[in-house]
């Protein structure tokens, strides 16, 4: 079992940071309040149990005054206990939400920095990081606090009821200790190991199925044009088959666990009566003592047999912690790629300088580029051409800092941006799409647009936007409300022109274009390159069209086996 449960160090590395963060005082305050509420609730339970036993004894003895007095206490405790239970659940849920918020912000910060999200996808070591951040963090915070409350309350119950049970029957208490130890060992070693593994696999299969459905939603037009509904149905149904198969395996184990838990719990219903009946018949105990002992026995068993009774929740929590620990461990590995032996050295500078650059495929089996050296000053545009698969896009990714399998050095321009063949349009307002990635929230946009480089925040800036949209031949978007999302899907050609509008709104010194005009006719392509030239933007382009040579001064031709040729284009 020790090989499957998360290591103690890894467990604490996930659970403890929040309680040591800047928000620790608020967190510890809520936790302290939770402990106080649980302590009070346990005390009320003890009094409730004693008064209940007193009522039963009074009924058996037909003592009316004693009965009504015990009933009054019983009812008062019952009324007081209800709000304590509700407030306790509320505080626990609130603390869980705060903890989840902090953890989510922490993981998103790691995931969306140092291009970790890209490296994770490139390496493929971690499945469904989005599901781990969304669902596993929720499971961690919710289940761990729930189990903490149960464990703490069980500890208080053990203190409160074990003494009561010992005072009534010592043999019953000894039996309870032995029974709980044996039951916990069976549950821990027989059910814990497979359930953690199966729960983790279920999380993965559910996330894969959800991702498959999201992929269909994101590619609806292409699938419809291909008439690929049957293929997509088959693939999605096959993926659901993995969900079904693993869940069937899971519920079989849960059936075994439930059978064990029910037998374990139901056996205890008759034990107190069997062990205490002789004392009752001998006149050493009242009937109320039997009632108290039975209730104390059940509550003490719940405290001692926590592993048995909460094993399903423990295994779900263990699976979530394991997946988050794997994700946490993957972040520093990806961040340290740049310092690995033979990695590419990246630094920023005023212009593009490449020295002795060699690129290989991620597995190191194929040489893409060998000993490339060149320099490109502002205004000296570069076109990269060559057959498919020789490493053109890999070279641009290396310049952008995304490709690390190789060696050499790259000095990249500080003021540069990248346009892929299919531009990314975030699901946001038209304003945010145009400013992406320089502003994400209305406050950031307003603050940024209030400076010297401001656009879009006043009537003049809106007029400037309309002018730029006309320059890239998108007049249909000129009157689109800036704070509303795009309601109609754009063609690839329109998306490419919109990406150029972004560049013209915030002109960089260099722009890296990875077949960024592939969906455009020659007239639109020529117009966009002319707009770049007028704005003093130096393009570094990948393309196959001979017409692109008209818009560039330098030509880098890549060929097989890592060979290349660098020349000037004569116009």
Positions of PLM-derived features:
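Membrane-integrated ABC transporters
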Residues: 1-45, 55, 59-74, 88-92, ...
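Extended non-transmembrane interhelical loops and adjacent amphipathic helices
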Residues: 2-16, 97-141, 208-213, 217-246, ...
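A hydrophobic transmembrane-helix motif
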Residues: 36, 47-49, 149-192, 245-292, ...
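An intracellular "coupling" helix at the cytosolic face of ABC transporter transmembrane type-1 domains
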Residues: 139, 197-205, 214-218, 224-271, ...
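Cytosolic ends of transmembrane helices, especially the final helix of ABC transmembrane type-1 domains
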Residues: 205-209, 224-228, 234, 272, ...
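Helix-to-loop junction immediately C-terminal to a conserved catalytic motif
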Residues: 400
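Conserved "ABC signature" C-loop
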Residues: 423-485
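ABC-family ATPase nucleotide-binding domain "signature/switch" substructure
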Residues: 483-571
């Amino acid at each position: 079992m020790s090989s499957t449960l998360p290591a103690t160090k890894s467990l604490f590395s996930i659970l403890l940071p929040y309680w040591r963060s800047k928000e620790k005082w608020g967190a510890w305050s809520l936790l302290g309040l939770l402990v106080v509420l649980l302590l009070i609730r346990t005390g009320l339970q003890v009094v409730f149990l004693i008064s209940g036993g007193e009522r039963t004894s009074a009924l058996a003895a037909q003592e009316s005054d004693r009965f009504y007095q015990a009933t009054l206490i019983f009812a008062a405790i019952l009324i007081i206990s209800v709000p304590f239970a509700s407030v306790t659940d509320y505080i626990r849920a609130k603390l869980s939400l705060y903890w989840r918020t902090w953890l989510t912000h922490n993981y998103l910060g790691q995931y969306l920095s140092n291009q970790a999200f890209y490296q994770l996808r490139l390496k493929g070591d971690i499945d469904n990081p989005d599901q781990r951040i969304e669902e596993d963090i929720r499971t961690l915070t919710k289940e761990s606090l729930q189990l903490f409350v149960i464990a703490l309350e069980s500890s208080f119950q053990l203190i409160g009821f074990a003494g009561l049970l010992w005072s009534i029957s010592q043999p019953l208490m000894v039996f309870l200790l032995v029974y709980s130890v044996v039951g916990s060992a069976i549950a821990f070693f027989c059910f814990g190991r497979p359930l953690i593994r199966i729960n983790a696999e279920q999380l993965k299969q559910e996330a894969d199925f959800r991702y498959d459905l999201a992929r269909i939603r994101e590619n609806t037009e292409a699938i419809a044009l291909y008439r690929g509904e049957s293929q997509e149905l088959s693939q999605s149904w096959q993926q659901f088959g993995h969900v079904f198969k693993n869940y069937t395996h899971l519920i079989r184990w849960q059936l075994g666990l439930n059978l064990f838990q029910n037998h374990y719990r139901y056996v205890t219903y008759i034990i107190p009566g069997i062990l205490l009946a002789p004392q009752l018949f001998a006149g050493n105990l009242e009937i109320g003592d039997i009632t108290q002992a039975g209730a104390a026995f059940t509550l003490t068993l719940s405290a001692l047999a926590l592993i048995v009774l909460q094993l399903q929740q423990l295994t779900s929590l263990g699976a979530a912690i394991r997946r988050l620990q794997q994700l946490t461990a993957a972040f520093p590995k990806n961040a340290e790629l740049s310092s690995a032996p033979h990695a590419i050295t990246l630094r920023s500078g005023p212009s593009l300088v490449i020295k002795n650059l060699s690129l290989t495929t991620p597995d190191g089996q194929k040489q893409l580029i060998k000993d490339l050296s060149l320099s490109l000053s502002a205004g000296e545009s570069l076109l990269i051409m060559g057959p498919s698969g020789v490493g053109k896009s890999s070279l641009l990714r290396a310049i952008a800092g995304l490709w690390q399998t190789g060696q050499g050095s790259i000095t990249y321009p500080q003021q540069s941006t990248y346009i892929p063949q299919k531009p990314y349009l975030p699901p946001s307002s038209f304003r945010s799409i145009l400013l992406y990635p320089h502003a994400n929230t209305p406050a950031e946009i307003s603050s940024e647009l209030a400076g010297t480089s401001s656009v879009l925040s006043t009537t003049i800036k809106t007029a400037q936007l309309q002018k730029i949209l006309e320059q890239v031949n998108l007049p249909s978007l000129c009157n689109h409300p800036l704070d509303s999302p795009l309601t109609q899907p754009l063609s690839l050609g329109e998306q490419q022109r919109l990406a150029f509008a972004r560049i013209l709104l915030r002109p960089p010194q260099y722009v890296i274009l990875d077949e960024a005009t592939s969906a455009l006719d020659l007239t639109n392509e020529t117009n966009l390159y002319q707009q770049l030239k007028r704005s003093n933007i130096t393009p570094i382009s990948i393309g196959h069209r001979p017409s692109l040579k008209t818009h560039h001064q330098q030509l880098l031709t890549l060929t097989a086996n890592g060979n290349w040729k660098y020349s000037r284009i004569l116009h």
